[in-house]
Amino acid sequence: KDFLYLEKQVDIYKLGSEEYEPKKESLDLCFTSPPYFDTEKYSLESTQSFVKFPTENEWINGFLKKTIENCYIGLKENRYMLINIADTPKHKFIEKETIRIAKELGFVQEDTLQLTLSSVMGAGYKYEPIFVFRKESK
């Protein structure tokens, strides 16, 4: 796709967010909506996070933490990371772990937005959080 209208360079990478190592302080924004461990299985390929990290603990430390860490390294000071991730009936602590990891790495939580998901006929709307974190100045 042609992104010249943005008048900025756009780089697109095809690899997992836990593998992408951005240049230090090169990003203005980091937005991610990672799969919720083994709840969203797109394929059984070895590139999938739930295949690479088969237990919840391995996934949190090997995938989620590394993804957040890469955002922190890449973000410029006072820039934002937004992460859409939610607890599931099977995994009830993903949200708390996300917040804990982000704060441990040095992010400040500034807000939590609500993402409105498609409604199911007669069931009303479902919401998921989008956590907003800022990388503080040193």
Task: State where each predicted segment sits.
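Class I S-adenosyl-L-methionine-dependent methyltransferase catalytic core
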Residues: 1-138
